[in-house]
């Protein structure tokens, strides 16, 4: 399995769309889309990573 990276430059954003493109984070939480995931990455000081695209 190749590591999948998400470019979170330009985050955090104050508001995310309701778009549903689930991402599973390394904390075993399903984020509804890249925006929500990237905001969480910034909040975690970069410790949160992407496990895989899709629901955990």
Curated annotation (Swiss-Prot):
GO terms for molecular function: serine-type endopeptidase inhibitor activity. The record marks 18-19 as: Reactive bond 3. SUPFAM superfamilies: Kazal-type serine protease inhibitors (SSF100895). Its main location: secreted. It is found in: Secreted. Disulfide bonds join 8-38, 16-35, 24-56. Keywords: Disulfide bond, Glycoprotein, Protease inhibitor, Repeat, Secreted, Serine protease inhibitor. CDD domains: KAZAL_FS. The keyword Disulfide bond applies. PROSITE patterns: KAZAL_1 (PS00282), KAZAL_2 (PS51465). Residues 6-56 form the Kazal-like domain. One of its GO terms (cellular component) is extracellular region. Glycans are attached at residue 45. Avian ovomucoid consists of three homologous, tandem Kazal family inhibitory domains. This is Ovomucoid.
């Amino acid at each position: 399995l190749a590591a999948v990276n998400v470019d979170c430059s330009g985050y955090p954003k104050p508001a995310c769309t309701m778009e549903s493109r689930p991402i599973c984070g390394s904390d075993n939480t399903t984020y509804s889309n890249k925006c929500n995931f990237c905001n969480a990455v910034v909040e975690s000081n970069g410790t949160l990573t992407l496990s895989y695209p899709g629901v955990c």
